[in-house]
UniProtKB/Swiss-Prot annotation:
This is Non-structural glycoprotein 4. The chain crosses the membrane at residues 29-51. GO terms for biological process: monoatomic ion transmembrane transport; symbiont-mediated activation of host autophagy; viral process. It comes from Rotavirus A (strain RVA/Rabbit/United States/ALA/XXXX/G3P11[14]) (RV-A). Gene3D superfamilies: 1.20.5.430.
């Protein structure tokens, strides 16, 4: 029944608009008829599209204020586009979403910088340790006797019988 009533209401509005337009057309001095007709068509379409949408949205949603605000912003943005403007109206919710996104990105970049600086500090510490191990330390006295095996060296006077056992002697071979 609601659909029939709505259809009857729509037909009566169209009939009213037609009779109004015919009354305007009878005046020969009316030069702005196409503009007025297009504006009336847009207004009628917005009226017919927005009222049922708003009723459904208000019945189904719990947060009616946000729905109404969103619908109104959408209608104004549509009108601005029809008028030729490139700017759009934004709500505080959209601005807050963008700000939250920017803040999340900044936090992510700060965490990345913190990780990178921590790694760089660790690398510098590692390089310092490697450098400390590679540097030559000056020592005053080094006991090289172990290296060249000179602790058990005897002089010629210390050999038994005064003879050097490593000195070659004459060898005779039988033929």
């Amino acid at each position: 029944m609601d659909k029939l009533t709505d259809l009857n209401y729509t037909l009566s509005v169209i009939t009213l608009m037609n009779s109004t337009l015919h009354a305007i057309l009878e005046d020969p001095g009316m030069a702005y008829f196409p503009y007025i007709a297009s504006v009336l068509t847009v207004l009628f379409t917005l009226h017919k599209a927005s009222i049922p949408t708003m009723k459904i949205a208000l019945k189904t949603s719990r947060c009616s204020y946000k729905v109404i605000k969103y619908c109104i912003v959408t209608i104004f943005n549509t009108l601005l586009k029809l008028a030729g403007y490139k700017e759009q109206i934004t709500t505080k919710d959209e601005i807050e979403k963008q700000m939250d996104r920017v803040i999340r990105e900044m936090r992510r970049q700060l965490e990345m910088i913190d990780k990178l600086t921590t790694r760089e500090i660790e690398q510098v510490e590692l390089l310092r340790r490697i450098y400390d191990r590679l540097t030559v330390r000056k020592t005053d006295e080094i006991d090289m006797s172990k290296e060249i095996n000179q602790k058990n060296i005897r002089t010629l006077d210390e050999w038994e019988n005064g003879k050097n056992p490593y000195e070659p002697s004459e060898v005779t071979a039988s033929l």
